[in-house]
């Protein structure tokens, strides 16, 4: 995971006028970053922003609020968040919580590596600990499809000032001031909208 050892911006250093950047009626000005990094999504210049959803997501970025976007499958919920992050030059990581994602995928694992010609075991942090420690918008896609063991891990970071204990390293991680969490869901916790028997 050497790719995770990159320089990310430290503090927002640019003001963005919501009316001009997102083409919606608002006097709001939000903070973002001047420069784009490799973790910032590409801008889709043809994307049209829904006003209510955009303002809710911007509140998440500006005021460190946890925001969940609900809607039907394929309506662009995750893309909406990514396109806002793209325009704010905010590093963004999207994790799909399908049935294949595990605690180890999120938290990290021991890996064997060569050091001075010898094999050693070293813990490699997963995307969750890395994201928590950086100015990153973490998007949990299909939040309602997450496995229970994975959801217990995520529960620990839902509080805006919540510390995160990484048991594998006997380490307590403090959330970066600019770490943000978003989620998308199809069912708002109500289960499948249609069940075939």
Where are each of the predicted segments found?
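AAA+ P-loop NTPase catalytic core and its hallmark functional loops
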Residues: 2-195
């Amino acid at each position: 995971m050497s790719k995770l050892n990159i320089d990310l911006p430290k503090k927002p250093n640019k003001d963005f006028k919501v009316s001009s950047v997102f083409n919606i009626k608002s006097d709001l000005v939000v903070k973002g970053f001047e420069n784009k990094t490799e973790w910032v999504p590409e801008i889709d210049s043809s994307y049209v922003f829904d006003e209510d959803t955009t303002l809710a997501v911007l509140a998440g970025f500006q005021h460190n609020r946890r925001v969940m976007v609900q809607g039907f499958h394929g309506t662009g919920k995750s893309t909406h968040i990514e396109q806002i992050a793209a325009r704010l030059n905010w590093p963004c990581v999207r994790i799909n919580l399908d049935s294949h994602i595990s605690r180890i995928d999120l938290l990290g694992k021991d890996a064997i590596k060569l050091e001075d010609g010898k094999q050693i075991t070293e813990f490699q942090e997963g995307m969750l600990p890395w994201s928590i420690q950086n100015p990153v918008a973490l998007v949990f896609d299909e939040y309602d499809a997450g496995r229970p063991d994975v959801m217990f891990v995520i529960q620990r970071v839902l509080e805006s000032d919540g510390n995160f204990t990484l048991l594998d390293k006997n380490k307590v991680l403090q959330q970066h001031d600019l770490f943000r969490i978003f989620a998308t869901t199809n069912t708002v916790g109500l289960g499948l909208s249609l069940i075939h028997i």
